[in-house]
From Swiss-Prot:
GO terms for biological process: translation. GO terms for molecular function: structural constituent of ribosome; tRNA binding. Part of the 30S ribosomal subunit. Pfam families: Ribosomal_S10. Keywords: Ribonucleoprotein, Ribosomal protein. It comes from Shewanella halifaxensis (strain HAW-EB4). Gene3D superfamilies: Ribosomal protein S10 domain. This is Small ribosomal subunit protein uS10. Belongs to the universal ribosomal protein uS10 family. The lineage of its organism: Bacteria, Pseudomonadati, Pseudomonadota, Gammaproteobacteria, Alteromonadales.
Length: 103
């Protein structure tokens, strides 16, 4: 796998789970002899929702909620066959969305 690069993007609502998952990925890649760049924190997306608490009147009474989506990026440069095999067997947390691209 010469001149290859694996780019892994992680998304989730809990930043502790994402940091734990990136640490597992980096440790696995370094253990198999690959060079790792990252984890790089990407901008956090904040979605805010405003909801009227009263069903009829009192427009001033509102609740506000926020949903934060945290993202991390990990690049694995020049991965070996062992690296790809170890990453495929890696079991990550359920609250983390993982996107893998080869480049």
């Amino acid at each position: 796998m010469q001149n290859q690069r694996i780019r892994i993007r992680l998304k989730g609502f809990d930043h502790r789970l994402i940091d734990q998952s990136t640490a597992e990925i980096v440790e696995t890649a370094k253990r198999t002899g690959a060079q790792v760049r990252g984890p790089i924190p990407l901008p956090t997306r904040k979605e805010r929702f405003t909801i009227l608490t009263s069903p009829h009147v009192n427009k001033d009474a509102r609740d506000q909620y926020e949903l934060r989506t945290h993202k991390r990026l990990v690049d694995i440069v020049e991965p070996t066959e062992k690296t790809v095999d170890a990453l495929m067997r890696l079991d990550l947390a359920a609250g983390v969305d993982v996107q893998i691209s080869l480049g």
